[in-house]
Amino acid sequence: QIKDLQEQIKRGRIMTVNGGYVYKANVVYSGVDLLGIDEIDIKTSTYRMDFYLWFRYRPNERDVDFKPDDFVFTNAEGEVEIAPIREETNADGTVLKTYRVSGTFKNQFRFYDYPFEHQDLIIEFRNQNATTSFIQYVVDRIGMRYESEEKLLGNYRENGAFSSIFGWQPQSARVDQDIFPTFSTFGNPQNFGRSVATNYSLINVNVDIQRDSLQYIVKSLLPLLITLILAYITFFLPLGHSERLAVGSTALLTTAFFHL
């Protein structure tokens, strides 16, 4: 049973087709232009992202609750700075809203292949109130010049997005559209008996980075190896007990220091 059927039809959310009723989803093109990545923290699996975010859509003046840019980040860690920088109407009647976004995000890192591992730096956002029946986010491939993952990575690189990360190398970038399901009833009695999820349209931005293994080996493993070799050589030198103990203690402390 559809709640407030006539009101939904009046707002343009539902239309009649062959005597039946169907939801009319509004397509909203969404794009992300990455400007910077820094503060990658492997202990907390967090990272800071700075980027432009925009929405392009055809307005629906009949529906006062039609708010395509009413979005929320699903993997934000703390407050996210969102600054509107542009709102304009294009010649074809579509509306463009652009934001500058900066904040810390989280995606659980995996270290199975350490120190040769890859990590995914992810940004996810969804519409906060409208389900997929009313609003569908679609990746704005044209606006992002997203011809391929390699092209998108190159665009981000030209923006200087990777100039502040050290010890990591970007490998690929992609943007996908998906759904965010929830089984919450939101306290609405109409949802108490529902066994299916409520779906919200979601955009996922994924930047794959790989640890710079050579840099890690030169800066971390090589000094340890040299220290251990020098400590081993002392066993073949004509040194007294106290001298050997001092060299061994120094090697042990040096090894512990490099693991801090």
What name fits each language-model region?
Residues Q1-N204:
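Soluble non-transmembrane domains of integral membrane proteins
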Residues L202-L260:
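Channel- or pocket-lining gating/hinge segments that regulate access to a cavity or pore
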